[in-house]
Curated annotation (Swiss-Prot):
Alphabetical keyword list: ATP-binding, Coenzyme A biosynthesis, Cytoplasm, Kinase, Nucleotide-binding, Transferase
Record-given protein name: Dephospho-CoA kinase
GO-annotated biological processes: coenzyme A biosynthetic process
GO cellular component entries: cytoplasm
Lineage, uppermost ranks: Bacteria, Fusobacteriati, Fusobacteriota, Fusobacteriia, Fusobacteriales
Native organism: Fusobacterium nucleatum subsp. nucleatum (strain ATCC 25586 / DSM 15643 / BCRC 10681 / CIP 101130 / JCM 8532 / KCTC 2640 / LMG 13131 / VPI 4355)
Amino acid sequence: MSIMIIGLTGGIASGKSTVSKYLAEKGFKVYDADKIAKDISEKKSVQEEIISTFGNKILDKNGNIDRKKLKEIVFENKEKLEKLNGIIHPKVINFYKELKEKKTDKVIIFDVPLLFESGIDKFCDKILVVISDYEVQLNRIIERDKINRELAEKIIKSQLSNEERIKKADVVIENNSNLEDLFKKVERFCETI
């Protein structure tokens, strides 16, 4: 069976997850890298590796990893972010590699925020990028994640720029308007699959 793998990516708060959910509702098989990474990071062996790398300062009072503390640490320091990604990314990449080899569905969507940075784009036949203007993105993050502007800016700056993503994309969907407009654009994309 011939299989098409679509890599779906976009910066934080660009609307990528909304597009991902919409595609899943349309019946496409979607594999969300954030969920896969979260599941991987909850394995005891991986948690031990994260704690030994970042120390007890990332733990809450119950001895569990405090994701908010960890996020603040890794987005303050690029080397620390790379260390965390070095623990998680190889395991996520392996998951996608195994999935591609299984050839289970006709069309599979890899929903990966760091598609290019992780190298997962190499497994994809087509790349769909969702972008939003910087200020739109910033306001969405602040509202959604209840974080301050400074941390939101650091998170955006830690990722590839829209310009860099666009260069590597087969299809670009701009999401600066409302959901109805976004879904119309996704429908047009679906007609090309």
